[in-house]
Amino acid sequence: MGKGFGDLPESLKYLRPFAITGVVGPNFPTQSNNVTFNADTGETEIGQNPKTLTWGFTLQYSLIYLQSFVKDIGLGAPFNRMILVTEFPMETCLSADCKGQITGTVNPGIVWVGKYTEFGLAAQIPINSRTGKSVGVLGLIHFFIDDLFPKSIGAPIFH
């Protein structure tokens, strides 16, 4: 689900390129336990697979929308095709020993959108020690197959 702010009044026109999206959903494991064999110790280890709730949201600012529908502020390529994005993907444990604990990251980044592809780059910052201790990097390469092949893959199935 999401909401763009293109309907804001003229006095708030520079906020119109903002959008927020969100997601929430339960995760149920197909097996309640994992059984692993430790070759070093010769012991069998049993770990629980908890039920979790995945939730999160993104905050986005589209420089494409700003340039096209609010005001052309003179951004040149490649900046006029960028979207500033911060993702907040989270997971809450609902069962087992981790019940109530939250893990997640904050992922500030940018996405460049072209006619046939988009590229993105973001930092991945853990929100707590359960999530991790180091900052990571996320990359995105997305090809718009329907635009690359509009007469075959991109064509309607039924006419």
Regions found by a protein language model. Give the residues of each.
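Outer-membrane beta-barrel "beta-signal"
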Residues: 57-61, 134-159
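Short loop/turn motifs that connect adjacent beta-strands in outer-membrane beta-barrel proteins
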Residues: 6-18, 64-82, 147-159
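Residues on the lipid-exposed face of transmembrane beta-strands in outer-membrane beta-barrel proteins
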Residues: 1-3, 26, 55-61, 108-112, ...
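Residues that define the transmembrane beta-barrel architecture of outer-membrane proteins
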Residues: 47-55, 80, 90, 100-106, ...
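A mid-sequence, solvent-exposed acidic-amphipathic segment
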Residues: 23-83
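Transmembrane beta-strands of outer-membrane beta-barrel pores
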Residues: 24-30, 63-65, 88-94, 114-116, ...
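Transmembrane beta-strands of outer-membrane beta-barrel proteins
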Residues: 13-24, 55, 69, 82-86, ...
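Outer-membrane beta-barrel translocator domains and adjoining extracellular loop/strand segments
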Residues: 31-44, 70-73, 94-104, 131-138, ...
